[in-house]
Amino acid sequence: MTQLTVSKKTPKPLVSISIPVLNEAANIPALYARLTGIAARMQDRCAMEFVFSDNHSDDQTWSLLTDLAKRDDRVRAIRFSKNCGFQRSILANYLHTRGDAVMQIDADLQDPPEMVEAFFDRWKQGYQVIYGIRRKRPEGIFINAFRKLGYWVIDKLSESPIPRDVGDFRMIDRKVIDVLAATRSSNPYLRGMIAGLGFNQTGIPYDRDARVAGESKFNITRLVRLGLTAVFNHSTVPLRMASLLGIVILFISVLGAAYYVFVRLFYPDLPRGFVSTQILILFGIGLNSFLLGIIGEYLLRIFVMLRSEPIAIIEQSLNFSDQELKL
């Protein structure tokens, strides 16, 4: 069994590889083989641990992690009592890492784990946040265009600049983890949260590979939901636009009323516009519903925050003591 000793006297920094998984049994053997190869190449520069968070998989994922944890003390894992969502699983896993630097990697191997070495070099140079910038990705034209549009909208509406073509493939310093731990958001959008924290940040361009095995857990619906979370968590622009639009409509209504009075005074014989009146009423109802929907999105997030729902509930763990479990 490979032993990992974490000590303040150890001159080498500890790098935690954080890996959220959901039904990734087909990818775990290849992922583990590549991670151990990287750890062997970097053993003179740093120590490593591999921290998995299982988002309540229903395949052999947890069994495979159990076997790995028995053979290798560097493998640590937590399993949630239910699927708590991708972003929350990442945040929960961050809280259970011990590294001086933490590298986020997806189990599907689309983001090459070997880039840990390049990320580590940037971290040693003093950067606290290093993210991968996707030059190209093996997806269809429609999905790529949809993602680019989403990145553009989020960047334009967000109050803090969020890097475009950037996912969750990143390395962050322990200081960033400590700040994230203090926020304890129950509905996080980590790209926006980390971008808004400041610190010394940089990006490394790379080409994304095709998924090795299994199926992607993201579809259009989940991408839209994630995009809405990004906008409403990190921007007050929709709320201010709703207020501004209300003022504009009120101004137009006043002008319309004045025009109507003027016309009726000087042209009393003109037929009254029943159809136009109904159209205006329907327009007003639709506009009010839209604006109330925007306000409702913000109220929903306030409700979720006040409800104090835990980020995740840990059902099982591997190579963790009870004192080390944070949730």
Language-model segments: residues:
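N-proximal low-complexity "stem/linker" segments adjacent to membrane-targeting elements
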Residues: 1-37, 45, 324
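Acceptor/aglycone-binding surface of glycosyltransferases and processive sugar-polymer synthases
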Residues: 78-96, 110-193, 209-228
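Hydrophobic helical membrane-anchoring modules
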Residues: 2-13, 189-327
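Donor nucleotide-sugar binding loop of glycosyltransferases
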Residues: 24-27, 57, 112
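A conserved acidic beta->alpha catalytic loop
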Residues: 54-63, 109-110
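Short beta-strand/loop segment that forms part of the nucleotide-sugar
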Residues: 43-56, 78-79
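Short aromatic/hydrophobic "clamp" motif used to bind/position activated sugar donors
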Residues: 102
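Short helix-capping segments at alpha-helix termini
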Residues: 40-45, 69-74
